[in-house]
Curated annotation (Swiss-Prot):
FMN binds at N71, Q175, G180, G218, Q237, M238, G239, T240. It holds the Pfam family NMO. Belongs to the nitronate monooxygenase family. NMO class I subfamily. GO terms for biological process: response to toxic substance. Binds 1 FMN per subunit. The keyword Oxidoreductase applies. It comes from Staphylococcus aureus (strain JH9). Its cofactor is FMN. P3N is a potent irreversible inhibitor of the key enzyme succinate dehydrogenase in the Krebs cycle and electron transport chain. P3N has been shown to be a toxic metabolite to bacteria, plants, fungi, mammals or any organism that uses succinate dehydrogenase. Keywords: Detoxification, Flavoprotein, FMN, Monooxygenase, Nucleotide-binding, Oxidoreductase. CDD domains: NPD_like. The keyword Flavoprotein applies. This is Probable nitronate monooxygenase. SUPFAM superfamilies: Inosine monophosphate dehydrogenase (IMPDH).
Amino acid sequence: MWNKNRLTQMLSIEYPIIQAGMAGSTTPKLVASVSNSGGLGTIGAGYFNTQQLEDEIDYVRQLTSNSFGVNVFVPSQQSYTSSQIENMNAWLKPYRRALHLEEPVVKIIEEQQFKCHIDTIIKKQVPVCCFTFGIPNESIIERLKEANIKLIGTATSVDEAIANEKAGMDAIVAQGSEAGGHRGSFLKPKNQLPMVGTISLVPQIVDVVSIPVIAAGGIMDGRGVLASIVLGAEGVQMGTAFLTSQDSNASELLRDAIINSKETDTVVTKAFSGKLARGINNRFIEEMSQYEGDIPDYPIQNELTSSIRKAAANIGDKELTHMWSGQSPRLATTHPANTIMSNIINQINQIMQYK
């Protein structure tokens, strides 16, 4: 059976389908619907404070008794100078003026927020913890394992996958370059961050690690799930497929933009957050490409552009806000999450029937 393997057993799920923990875009209804449909729903906790995360976990538990996960951002070493911030603020001033915004005060609370997230996950006995942007330190991994929490890391290269396994992850998401949103890269090669496609990345990781591999990037339906399994993955993680669901927290602006876009419309940019992320190209990205200075690293740039993005989204201006999307938007739907899950499963079963 395609849906019975080490991953489904480890995560206590019926189908090896994980809804990506998209920070700012998941809702308790989305998470619970995926879990109730036999997959693993995941709370995107990246931007939550402690109380918000506790409330989200409690709400999900009211809606499902099945397994679910929480995705957290691993803090990275920030490299920035005051002149970088000053220069970026000067560049962003016309956007703020047009939207009647003040210059923000940058607060770096990443490390503290991450520690609180880990404490909350342990306190609330969340079944699964997923990591993006790196690997937590040994003591955090030990604490989570002592609490019997399953750990899923993210890799965009073979070296990152090996590092995840050595650190003690129970499974690895192999994030191909087709994936929407932020790249999960954390080992920086000499030239640039890895941009390896899913079909190339998955089998190369499968061949060098002994733990289950979860394919991610461009997977939207049953065909993508089965293709991933053929490549050696034991499951898939899907983001954009659930982002456009009516159960997600995506704005109508973003939902419509994805549904009406095509595979050539996305680019990978640091313009909005200081980390490479794939989204639909727009005026802000185009104009930021002309910026001659160094874009401050995440989370600095994310803080500097936050009010601009929110204000633009509030007035329906898709040219000045981030529109994260993977490279398969033509396959996106606005169905409820449980319908998306049942359609995927039915399509897989139909394909298997004819093979």
